[in-house]
């Protein structure tokens, strides 16, 4: 939930500023904004990944002191934490696709991801197709696989004609004025 709040603010900035620069036809600046969002969402996602994977027990202690629940939570977070690493990046790709008039593509990717997650949840949690029931760990694994598919689809599609993909050069560059605008929109 907390990670999603940060990601929502960053991707909202990407969407707002992105729509302005897309409307102007300024793909260069749009790429810079996309890269800013990727950097920020990547950082936020990395922080939550580290917290969940390496400090899951302490995070669970914030919510409960029941050992059984803590153990379930830790086993979930150790796997699902990796999906948190991917979520911020895939959300940036999906927002830039919407901004650049490819909303249908994002709807297809997002719907497919949800369907994959639901199907894999059923298989992994309860067992099926020769897979042993995994319970909570199965739910985490289903989420991770769905996020991997979502990110892979988003990145691969971004290289199609008329889609935007980030410039590696702009991932390392910082534009002070654009950063101010980005932060204003996000707050």
Protein language model features and the residues they cover:
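Cytoplasmic helix-loop-helix junction between adjacent transmembrane helices
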Residues: 65-66, 70-73, 77, 84-111
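Short, Lys/Arg-enriched charge-dense amphipathic segments
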Residues: 91-92, 110-117, 150, 186
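Alpha-helical transmembrane segments of multi-pass membrane transporters/permeases
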Residues: 41, 96-123, 137-144
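Hydrophobic/small/kink-forming positions within alpha-helical transmembrane segments
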Residues: 9, 50, 114-115, 148
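Generic detector of short alpha-helix boundary/capping microenvironments
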Residues: 6-7, 13, 61, 76, ...
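Alpha-helical transmembrane segments of multipass membrane proteins
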Residues: 50, 58, 92-96, 115, ...
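Small-residue-rich hydrophobic transmembrane alpha-helices
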Residues: 1-50, 87-106
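Short alpha-helical transmembrane segments in multi-pass integral membrane proteins
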Residues: 18-83, 131-186
């Amino acid at each position: 939930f907390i990670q999603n709040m940060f990601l929502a603010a960053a991707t909202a900035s990407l969407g707002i500023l992105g729509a302005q620069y897309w409307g102007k036809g300024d793909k260069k600046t749009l790429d810079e904004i996309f890269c800013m969002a990727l950097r920020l969402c990547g950082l936020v996602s990395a922080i939550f990944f580290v917290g969940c994977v390496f400090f899951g027990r302490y995070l669970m202690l914030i919510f409960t002191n029941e050992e059984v629940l803590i153990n379930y939570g830790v086993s979930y977070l150790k796997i699902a934490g990796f999906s948190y690493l991917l979520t911020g990046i895939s959300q940036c790709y999906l927002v830039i696709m919407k901004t650049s008039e490819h909303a249908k593509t994002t709807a297809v990717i997002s719907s497919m991801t949800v369907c994959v997650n639901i199907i894999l949840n059923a298989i992994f949690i309860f067992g099926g197709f020769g897979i042993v029931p995994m319970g909570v760990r199965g739910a985490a694994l289903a989420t991770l696989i769905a996020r991997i598919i979502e990110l892979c689809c988003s990145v691969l599609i971004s290289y199609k004609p008329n889609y935007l993909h980030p410039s590696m050069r702009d991932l390392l560059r910082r534009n002070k004025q654009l950063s101010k605008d980005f932060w204003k929109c996000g707050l």
